[in-house]
Amino acid sequence: MEASFVQTTMALGLSSKKASSRNVAVERKNLITVCRFSVKTLLEKYTAEPIDDSSEEFVNFAAILEQILSHRFKACAPAGPVSWFSSDGQRGFWDYIRLACSKVPNNCVSSIENMENISTARAKGRAWIRVALMEKRMSEYITTALRDTRTTRRFYDSGAIMLRDEATILTGMLIGLSAIDFSFCLKGEVLDGKTPVVIDYTPYLKFTQSYDYLTDEEERHSAESSTSEDNSPEHPYLPLVTDEDSWYSKWHKMEQKFRIVYAQKGYLEELVRLRESQLKDLEAENRRLQLQLEEAAAQNQREKRELEGVILELQEQLTGLIPSDHAPLAQGSKELTTPLVNQWPSLGTLNGAEGASNSKLYRRHSFMSTEPLSAEASLSSDSQRLGEGTRDEEPWGPIGKDPTPSMLGLCGSLASIPSCKSLASFKSNECLVSDSPEGSPALSPS
């Protein structure tokens, strides 16, 4: 028995949930439909003249739009649940608009926040509706707000118009209002936030439907039977005007529709031109940035090649400056980048017998400047010690050390050169040494 009671309760809860969702769907559909009728009425009557607060059609449209923005809004009440049409909530749709529309360029949110005569959230929301219509940017505001899905879900319950596909339909309808000039005064009792909004459905319940739009045969037969029984000229399906008035009214309606479509066409063409100009500017900026990128890449490659060449040149110079450890002295002297010229000690002073035979060791060398010569002037004393070490036919050079190229600086002296400064007066970069048996000048202590 308890199980059956639980099942019954669950079935009732499920049915009530379905009924609630069905009611919400009906509310959504009704609000979108009446909003479409209201926008159509505004476009038909006020395309050629501005609209202000005295227009009943606008007052009704503002009430409908406020109801749509407040549909399933999470309003916080002091106690008890708040319905979607209640005016007892602590906050209104303005709190959502203030956050979701803050990213719109040149928006009116800050100006409405700074209004002194408007304090409540409802009054600010109504002021925003009027300012957005005067700016002809209502559709842009709503579209930007819908893109912020996180904020929208935070302010609206499931089933709200702002969370459904009907919101896209709403933005499409609001585009047509850009063809109307609105003029409002943001002062008065309509913006105090205390007066609840009421939608007047009576203008949209009066309609005339012709037989051409009837699709159900039974409905057509019932209409014919009711016409024959009542035989009353006030039947809604019978024409109440003459043919001339009918044609004139049709022509007037067609003219109004043409003006509306023409105004919307001009607005859309202007919008397309604006977007095309923006697209051209962006394409030009893109090309400019591409050229800058290509130039930067080419310059980078050139600098890279130059640096690689410098690295290779420095490696070659470093390889030439660092000889092998056990190479002969002559081979090491050949590897010098700046050879020593006329800096060898006199062979006669070292060994008289070997001086004449080895005097041909002098070669012709070239030097670039006098700096390498002057840099080794301080090594003359070491050269004298080398000369003393070669007496009695002993090999010249320090005993116990290898004659490696690192000791080349100890093999010569600048004492035989009259002056290092006189080298700058040489007309040629090459020095020719004769093969005469005369030895070099004796070493002079430094």
From Swiss-Prot:
Residues 372-384 have a biased composition (Polar residues). Residues 1-298 are annotated as: Interaction with RAP2A. Residues 267-322 form a coiled coil. One of its GO terms (cellular component) is intracellular membrane-bounded organelle. Keywords: Coiled coil, Phosphoprotein. The keyword Phosphoprotein applies. It comes from the Eukaryota. One of its GO terms (molecular function) is GTPase regulator activity. The modification Phosphothreonine is found at residue 215. Residues 52-189 form the RUN domain. Residues 216-239, 372-404 are annotated as: Disordered. The modification Phosphoserine is found at residues 232, 416, 419. One of its GO terms (biological process) is small GTPase-mediated signal transduction. Interacts with the GTP-bound form of RAP2A. This is RUN domain-containing protein 3A.
